[in-house]
């Protein structure tokens, strides 16, 4: 499948903001969204959603023009700030004293957050991290086209922080016609490795694209995860078949809807295929095990523009003495060692070393070292 969609580009570092007086302060989520809107990561979006598109996305998983889009990308402001704004004006977008862009306001509206929570996250339970964040953010949304006027100083992972145009170029340079994307917020354990390598058997390249934006407090820190990916790729993957780059978005924990969103974004980064595993982007027990795969049946491959690859839950089978899934292994549950990022995190935080059936020893060493450092700095 060739990539025909045009990338949005809303970057203009020469744009004059000196005459613009009003400003909106961005939180970390809005800041990372601003960057991804501007670089084309969120193509076809050109800005934060106005009311018509917002309502359409929340209710139908499509923009008002019918294009598939499953997560509302919004710019929340307080009532006080909203009172000072009006449609038709340009306003600076600021974070931590720096001006990063402008928004050309088209719309100011009050969303029904309970409805957004129920339809996007399938729950109004504030124990859900996505719902909690939704309710914590201000209550008025500002919609409009954006311009990014200043690039972020990406000090944490500068060499891995690439725009969609750059990853597309990198794939082209390698001669990859088919590329499978893999989204992760966890260290890669053996079940992930099995799935990635199974997918790699049928495509030219693997795009490992860990999310490094805002995540839950008990998720393993991004710098530790990045080091774990580096040692894994160095020791267990063919160098000419994998590409590592970060995804600077915040985690929404929206399960099925976020699986669609993650696929659409990876299409923009240049992928032709996208891996959807068990409970993709899930949290707790809010979503069914394979709900994130089932949601794809609502859309055609043509309108998605990317082919999802579905994988069953994989495990280590003590009888097969190998990684397997129920599709490839005849043995019972008593012979299966179930692996999960949650389990690996749990073992590590309890000071236990995950067995080699769970994680590669080089990865475990990095995680132990990283978590010790985390404990020291807390």
Curated annotation (Swiss-Prot):
Signal peptide (UniProt feature, chain positions): none
Superkingdom of source: Bacteria
Keywords assigned: ATP-binding, Nucleotide-binding, Nucleotidyltransferase, Transferase
Pfam families in the record: ATP-sulfurylase (PF01747), PUA_2 (PF14306)
S-S bonds: none
Pathway the protein takes part in: Sulfur metabolism; hydrogen sulfide biosynthesis; sulfite from sulfate: step 1/3
CDD domains attached to this UniProt entry: ATPS
InterPro entries per the UniProt record, alphabetical: ATP-Sase_PUA-like_dom, PUA-like_sf, Rossmann-like_a/b/a_fold, SO4_adenylyltransferase_pro, Sulfurylase_cat_dom, Sulphate_adenylyltransferase
Tagged with keyword Lipid metabolism: no
EC number(s) per entry: 2.7.7.4
Gene Ontology molecular functions: ATP binding; sulfate adenylyltransferase (ATP) activity
Name of the protein: Sulfate adenylyltransferase
Gene name tied to this protein: sat
């Amino acid at each position: 499948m060739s990539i025909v969609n045009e990338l949005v580009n809303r970057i203009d570092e020469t744009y004059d903001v000196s005459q613009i007086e009003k400003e909106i302060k961005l939180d970390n989520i809005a800041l990372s969204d601003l960057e991804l809107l501007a670089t084309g990561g969120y193509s076809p979006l050109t800005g934060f959603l106005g009311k018509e598109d917002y309502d359409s996305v929340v209710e139908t998983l499509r923009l008002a023009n019918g294009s598939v889009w499953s997560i509302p990308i919004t710019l929340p402001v307080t009532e006080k700030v909203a009172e000072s704004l009006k449609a038709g004006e340009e306003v600076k977008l600021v974070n931590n004293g720096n001006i990063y862009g402008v928004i050309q306001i088209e719309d100011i509206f009050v969303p029904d957050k309970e409805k957004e929570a129920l339809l996007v996250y399938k729950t109004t339970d504030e124990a859900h991290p996505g719902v909690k964040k939704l309710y914590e953010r201000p209550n008025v949304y500002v919609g409009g086209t954006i311009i990014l006027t200043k690039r972020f100083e990406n000090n944490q992972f500068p060499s891995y922080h690439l725009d969609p145009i750059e990853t597309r170029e990198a794939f082209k340079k390698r001669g990859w016609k088919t590329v499978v994307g893999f989204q992760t917020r966890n260290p890669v354990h053996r079940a992930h490795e099995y799935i990635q390598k199974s997918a790699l058997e049928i495509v030219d390249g693997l795009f490992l694209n860990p999310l490094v934006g805002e995540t839950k407090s008990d998720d393993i820190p991004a710098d530790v995860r990045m080091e774990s990916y580096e040692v894994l790729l160095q020791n267990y993957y063919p160098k000419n078949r994998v590409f590592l780059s970060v995804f600077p978005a915040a985690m929404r924990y929206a399960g099925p809807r976020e699986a669609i969103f993650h696929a659409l974004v990876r299409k923009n980064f240049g992928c032709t295929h996208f891996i959807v595993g068990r409970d993709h982007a899930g949290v707790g027990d809010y979503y069914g095990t394979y709900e994130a795969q089932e949601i794809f049946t609502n859309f055609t491959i043509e309108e998605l523009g990317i082919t999802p690859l579905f994988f069953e839950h994989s495990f280590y089978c003590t009888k097969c003495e190998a990684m397997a899934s129920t599709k490839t292994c005849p043995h019972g549950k008593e012979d299966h060692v179930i692996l999960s990022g949650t389990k690996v995190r749990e073992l590590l935080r309890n000071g236990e070393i995950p067995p080699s059936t769970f994680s590669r020893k080089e990865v475990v060493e990095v995680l132990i070292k990283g978590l010790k450092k985390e404990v020291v700095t807390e």
